[in-house]
Regions:
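Periplasmic OmpA-like peptidoglycan-binding domain that tethers envelope proteins to the cell wall
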Residues: 63-155
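Periplasmic peptidoglycan-binding/tethering modules of Gram-negative envelope proteins
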Residues: 1-59, 131-155
């Protein structure tokens, strides 16, 4: 008689973590009335891209925002240009465009409602919302290393 065939069952899959803590910025900032990526913001986006390359299950929603000092229509378009330039920068860093969605809120979701120069700088931003497509909770840090304050005008 033939010896019995021994089948080794496959190892059970490793359980997914409950939460992933990412040392990853959640926003980048822009100069007054600009949508181009500054050198400092570019460094922030490169840091984000590096983390995203290590975590292929994470997708991103980009939301463009402005300060309140123009018409709502203009600010909607400016917020969208900011979100697009941020997406394009991520794509140039090797992140697949399918992982990124963009939208603009213009001036409708101010980070801070006050009206000094620092508050305006905080409002001129693109926010990153990260989601793990497997449903794992993500813990994210915020940063302001690339705030771009405008120069005070001389009277």
């Amino acid at each position: 008689p033939k010896p019995p065939v021994v089948v080794t069952p496959p190892a059970p899959p490793k359980p997914l973590p409950q939460k992933i803590r990412l040392e990853i910025p959640a926003n980048v900032h822009f100069a007054l009335d600009k949508s181009n990526i500054s050198a400092r913001s570019g460094e922030v986006i490169k840091q984000i891209a590096k983390v995203l390359q290590q975590h292929p299950y994470i997708v991103i929603d980009l939301e463009g925002h402005t300060d309140p000092r123009a018409s709502n229509d203009y600010n909607q378009r400016l917020g969208l240009r900011r979100a697009k330039s941020t997406r394009d920068y991520l794509v140039r860093q090797g992140i697949a465009p399918e992982r990124i969605t963009i939208r603009s809120y213009g001036e409708t979701k101010l980070k801070t409602p006050r009206i000094d120069i620092l508050d305006h700088a905080r409002n001129r931003r693109v926010e990153f919302f990260y989601r793990d497509i497997r449903g794992i909770e993500l813990e994210i840090i915020e940063q302001e290393n690339d705030l771009q304050l405008e120069q005070k005008r001389r009277s």
